[in-house]
A protein has these predicted regions:
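Short, aliphatic-rich beta-strand segments
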Residues: 60-65
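Short, functionally critical alpha-helical segments immediately adjacent to catalytic or ligand/cofactor-binding
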Residues: 42-44, 78-82
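Membrane-embedded and juxtamembrane structural elements of multi-pass membrane proteins
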Residues: 53-56, 88-112, 125
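Intrinsic structural disorder
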Residues: 49, 53-54, 80-81, 103-106, ...
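Active-site His/Glu-centered metal-binding helix of metallohydrolases
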Residues: 81-90, 115, 119
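C-terminal capping/extension segments of zinc metalloprotease domains
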Residues: 1-24, 31-43, 68-69, 74, ...
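Catalytic zinc-binding patch centered on the HExxH motif and its immediate surroundings
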Residues: 42-59
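Catalytic Zn2+-binding segment of zinc metalloproteases
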Residues: 67-68, 72-76, 84-100, 128-129
Length: 215
């Protein structure tokens, strides 16, 4: 059962409401998905930093104040936190299996970003949040560098297209009953992703299993 989107009305400069909210969302995702690995969630009230990061060594997920400013509801914040939880899980797997390290991540960072995006969609759905918020928050905060080669992350347009395809394939009910259809950031995604969505339509039409090369 999806939780109705709740607007963020917090003043994280005056009290601990931001910390309480981030912890609540984080532990809700952990518990709903039966994730046994230990991790903690912190807020750094720096409004100039629009980001969330995972510190592999300490399994700390840090949400910066700027991200709270850009997040319009709990769905969007949950999408980002779920993405970082995926990275934290991989850090645990590395300690236990000996294959994951910052060096490994630095060699194939885009692979881990795509993996974290898809797993985050699963996590938020299981926790009762709307996965389409992943598209709206990413469209707001993730820049589109001119050259992907020199970036540690895939192009935002490709990440958005891959997330949309994953939701379309695995959770189509969220597109049928789309509570974000009138959201200006979702509308902008529809505008800017037309070519990529046509590629997806062609794949579905031909019942193809090939991976789409998104733009």
């Amino acid at each position: 059962i999806a939780i109705p989107s709740q607007a963020l009305t917090i003043d994280y400069t005056k009290d601990g409401s931001a910390q309480a909210l981030v912890s609540k969302i984080g532990f809700n995702i952990l518990n709903a998905n039966r994730i046994p690995q230990r991790m903690v969630f912190y807020v750094k009230p720096d409004k100039k930093v629009v980001n969330a990061v995972t510190y592999f060594r300490d399994r700390q997920i840090v949400v910066y104040g700027g991200l709270l400013t850009y997040s319009d509801n709990e769905d969007e914040l949950a999408a980002v936190i779920a993405h970082e939880i995926s990275h934290a899980i991989d850090s645990y797997d590395g300690v236990l299996r000996g294959f994951f390290s910052p060096v490994t991540y630095s060699l194939k960072p885009k692979k881990y970003e795509y993996k974290a995006d898809k797993r985050a969609v699963d996590f938020v759905v299981k926790a009762g949040y709307n996965p389409l918020a992943f598209i709206t928050i990413m469209n707001k905060i993730d820049s589109q560098p001119r050259y992907e080669l020199f970036s540690t992350h895939p192009l935002c347009s490709r990440r958005l297209a891959a997330v949309y395809e994953y939701i379309y394939t695995k959770y189509p009910q969220y597109l049928v009953q789309n509570e974000y259809k009138d959201n200006i950031y979702y509308q902008n995604f529809l505008l800017t992703s037309r070519e990529n969505r046509l590629k997806l339509q062609e794949k579905v039409k031909n019942n193809s299993k090939k991976r789409i090369k998104y733009l």
